[in-house]
Amino acid sequence: MPVRPALVLSLLVLTPVSAASGASDPSGVWTRGDGNARVRIAPCGGNICATNLWIGDTSGGENVGDRLVLTVSAGGEGTLVGTAYDPQRNLTYSMEMTVKARQLQTRGCVLGGLLCKSVTWSRED
């Protein structure tokens, strides 16, 4: 079962972005390191959502408009930790996001951390 952080993110959603420090704010448009996905991370309700804006190869089951709902909180210097819920697949991932000025590192895990995937993203905006 592959972990899909392209919604961010495969990767995120916990508390509002404003609850995290400005340096840890993942809001914005991000391009996945392999160039196959572009997502927007923004507040949605009381959470954060990562929404696919563009997918180059949809054979992996990812589609434009797919969304991850992230529940995250500050976990240390520039790091957010929590869960990401994928409503399209009814899956919840544990996740960690490390936010830098122009880079986002996401790590999502399932099965109690037995199956994990890390993805690097570059800020577009």
Sequence positions of predicted segments:
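A short, compositionally biased
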Residues: 23-25, 78, 100-102
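Positively charged n-region of N-terminal signal peptides that target proteins for export
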Residues: 1-5
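Edge beta-strand at a domain terminus
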Residues: 111-125
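N-terminal helix-cap/turn-to-beta initiation motif at the start of protein domains
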Residues: 19-29, 125
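Short, exposed beta-strand-loop hairpins at the edges of beta-sheets
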Residues: 94-115
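Bacterial N-terminal signal peptides
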Residues: 6-16
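Central antiparallel beta-sheet cores of small beta-barrel/beta-sandwich binding domains
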Residues: 26-95
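A short, sequence-level motif marking secondary-structure junctions
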Residues: 43-46, 98-102, 122-125
